Structure formats: structure tokens, C-alpha cells
From Swiss-Prot:
Belongs to the periviscerokinin family. InterPro entries: Periviscerokinin (IPR013231). It comes from Mantis religiosa (Praying mantis). The modification Leucine amide is found at L16. Keywords: Amidation, Neuropeptide, Secreted. The keyword Mitochondrion does not apply. One of its GO terms (biological process) is neuropeptide signaling pathway. It is found in: Secreted. Mediates visceral muscle contractile activity (myotropic activity). This is Periviscerokinin-3.
Length: 16
């Protein structure tokens, strides 16, 4: 899903 992807992405981007 996009909604879940955006939320997880926001936390995954800085972590990467």
C-alpha cells in the first residue's frame, strides 16, 4: 500500500 509505504519510508529514509 502507499499509505503504509510512506509512513515506513519516512522512518526508513533517515535510518538508511
Amino acid at each position: 500500500g502507499k499509505t503504509k509505504g510512506v509512513t515506513s519510508g519516512l522512518i526508513a529514509f533517515p535510518r538508511l
